[in-house]
Structures are given as C-alpha cells and as structure tokens.
C-alpha cells in the first residue's frame, strides 16, 4: 500500500487490516518511509486508537525481523509496558528470578530505562549479567539454567529506524504496547503488566492473535487509585486471563492471597545500584515484607502461566518455596557465573 493511501485511511479514522498493518510496519522497519510519514502514522494510530488486528499485524512485522533465538515452547516472560510513573523497584525482574528458582523456564525480554530510573537491563547489568550475550550463547545459558535475558536493542536491530522518531514525538505510541509482545523467543506464556486499564482487552485479543497459550494481563492500583503496570499489593488488581483462546476477567485484592497491603512508598526503587540492592535483599531474605510480597505476587503468576502451579495461590506457595529454600538465590548465582563464562569465550 502506498503511504498516501495509508495516511488517508488513518486520517479518516479507518482501521487497518492485519495484513495492511503488517505491510505498513515492515515498510517502517525497512526504512521505506520518510521520517515525517512514520511520525504521522504513529500519531494518527494513537489518535484513532489501535485495534487487536493492528497490534497483531505490527507484531508479525517486527518479530519477522528480530534476531532468532530458540528457547523452546514453555518459556515464560514477565514484562510490563512501563509508563506508570510509580517509581517502583524492578518487580517483574525479581519475580522472574524467583519463578526460575521454582523451576519455571524464563525468557525475560527487557530494555534499559525509558520511563523509570532503572530498567530490567540496567539492574541485571549492575549485578554483573552480560546483557549483550549473543543468541547462540544465550541458548546455551538457557539450556543449562532455564533462564535467559533478551536485551531488546540487540534482538530488534530494525527498531533503530524509529528510535529517534519516537523520541522526537514525545508521546505514547503503539510501540509502548508492542514492547512486551515482541519477545524474540516468541513465547506463548506471559505475565504482562499494563499501565492503562483501557488497553487490557486489546492486549488480550492481540495475544490470542499472536499465538499465546496462557497469559495474564494485569493492571494494579495504588492506595490512591493510581495505575500500576504490575500486580498490586497496595490496592486491587484487575487480571485478564487468556488460556486456549478463551478470555476471562476478574478483580482481586491482596487479601485474596493472604498478602498484607502496603503503600506505594514502601515499593519505591531508585537507580540501578539501589534496585540491585533490593533484588539481592529479597533473594537473601533481608528485604522488607512489602518488597518481598510484591515480588512473590508477580512470581506466583509466572508459576501459574508456566503450568508449574494449578492456580495463583498454588503459584504463591511455589514462589515462597523458591525463596525460603534459598533456591532462587543459588540459581541466580549460577546464572550469573555461567553468563560471565559464556561472555568470556
């Protein structure tokens, strides 16, 4: 489709088909459109509101150009959209490590900080993880430990074509939604935290279209009613569950899982050094109860979607066992050691 025809459709508020969107984003990734046209497409999509078909079309365009990495069919990703401005520590990253200690294979897709002071890549790098490990060695690490971190800029080199345009636009675009979806390992099991409750249904429908087998899309609230792209122990959490093509929705409270409420201030993070310290304290048992419970809640969800647990309650039991036995800490030390060894070869 010529970009003038594409722009005309978007200007009139017409939704694109999945095929049209895939062709459009393939053109964007390949640098076939002028920067001004790409900026217009992104802004008009945002104004119109994206559909699941459009999100899925963009997904297929981006994933087809990602560096391939083979991590099997059962790996789980815990990744949020960011954008909630809450300043929490790296909850989903700690949750992934705890779940891995419970036997859950993890393919954590992440990046450096965009909307916070410390992204998942920043905190892992602070702890010594070599985030630029190439795909073949990442596969070796995963085979030995069941854990891999997939640094988004390494696996999505074509995304560089739009990075400066996104910065110049300075608004949320469809790319903010796509981040958690375009895991280069093509995971079928996910826990996705979203910053805006209004996009939960779009996410769920998009996940079905991209081949998801079991996922939880979550949006939490603070004690003040502000949104979080995490499951919350400060207030209620809405969970949209996708399993075998079916979508269900329910709201839960911390007390549903015998978790104590806390304030958002108790979950505040900081720079990579501060967040790395919190992560290690959670693993060694010296963190606050609020910090530990927040990580356990998200880890429980990862255990559930992996199939290692029959429900979130059972997942919480598995996650607690991972921490209390010391297995999460030992496993993470093993991951760091092997990661460094592979990076040095």
From Swiss-Prot:
InterPro entries: Anthranilate_Pribosyl_Tfrase, Glycosyl_Trfase_fam3, Glycosyl_Trfase_fam3_N_dom, Glycosyl_Trfase_fam3_N_dom_sf, Nuc_phospho_transferase
Binding site residues for Mg(2+) 1: 92, 230
Name used for this protein in its record: Anthranilate phosphoribosyltransferase
BP term (GO), one: L-tryptophan biosynthetic process
Enzyme category, top tier: transferase
Keywords tagged on the record: Amino-acid biosynthesis, Aromatic amino acid biosynthesis, Glycosyltransferase, Magnesium, Metal-binding, Transferase, Tryptophan biosynthesis
Purpose of the protein: Catalyzes the transfer of the phosphoribosyl group of 5-phosphorylribose-1-pyrophosphate (PRPP) to anthranilate to yield N-(5'-phosphoribosyl)-anthranilate (PRA).
Required cofactor(s): Mg(2+)
Subunit details: Homodimer.
Covalent S-S links between cysteines: none
Organism lineage string: Bacteria, Pseudomonadati, Chlorobiota, Chlorobiia, Chlorobiales
Cofactor note: Binds 2 magnesium ions per monomer.
The family this protein is said to belong to: Belongs to the anthranilate phosphoribosyltransferase family.
Database matches in PANTHER family: ANTHRANILATE PHOSPHORIBOSYLTRANSFERASE
GO terms, molecular function: anthranilate phosphoribosyltransferase activity; magnesium ion binding
């Amino acid at each position: 489709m010529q970009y003038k025809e594409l722009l005309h459709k978007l200007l009139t508020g017409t939704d694109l088909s999945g095929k049209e969107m895939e062709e459009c984003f393939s053109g964007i990734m390949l640098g076939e459109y002028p920067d001004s046209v790409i900026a217009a497409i992104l802004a008009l999509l945002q104004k119109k509101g994206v559909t699941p078909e459009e999100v899925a079309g963009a997904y297929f365009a981006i994933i087809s150009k990602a560096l391939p990495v083979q991590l099997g069919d059962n790996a789980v990703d815990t990744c949020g959209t960011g954008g909630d401005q809450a300043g929490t520590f790296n909850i989903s990253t700690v949750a992934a490590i705890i779940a891995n200690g419970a036997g859950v294979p993890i393919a954590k897709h992440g990046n450096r900080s965009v909307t916070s002071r410390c992204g998942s890549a920043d905190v892992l790098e602070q702890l010594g993880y070599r985030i630029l490990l190439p795909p073949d060695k990442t596969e070796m690490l995963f085979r030995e430990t069941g854990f891999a971190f997939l640094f988004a800029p390494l696996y999505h080199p074509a995304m560089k074509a739009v990075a400066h345009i996104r910065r110049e636009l300075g608004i949320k675009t469809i790319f903010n939604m796509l981040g958690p979806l375009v895991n280069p390992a093509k995971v079928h099991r996910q826990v996705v935290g979203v910053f805006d409750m209004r996009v939960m249904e779009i996410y769920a429908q998009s996940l079905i279209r991209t081949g998801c087998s079991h996922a939880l899309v979550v949006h939490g609230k603070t004690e003040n009613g502000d949104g979080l792209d995490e499951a919350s122990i400060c207030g209620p959490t809405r969970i949209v569950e996708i399993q075998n093509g079916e979508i269900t929705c329910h709201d839960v409270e911390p007390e549903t899982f015998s978790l104590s409420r806390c304030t958002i201030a108790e979950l505040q993070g900081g720079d990579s050094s501060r967040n790395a310290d919190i992560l290690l304290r959670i693993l060694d048992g010296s963190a606050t109860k609020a910090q530990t419970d927040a990580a356990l809640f998200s880890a429980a969800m990862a255990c559930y979607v992996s199939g290692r647990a029959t429900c979130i309650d059972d997942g919480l039991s598995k996650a607690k066992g991972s921490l209390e036995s010391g297995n999460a800490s030992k496993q993470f030390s093993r991951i760091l050691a092997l990661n460094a060894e592979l990076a040095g070869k």
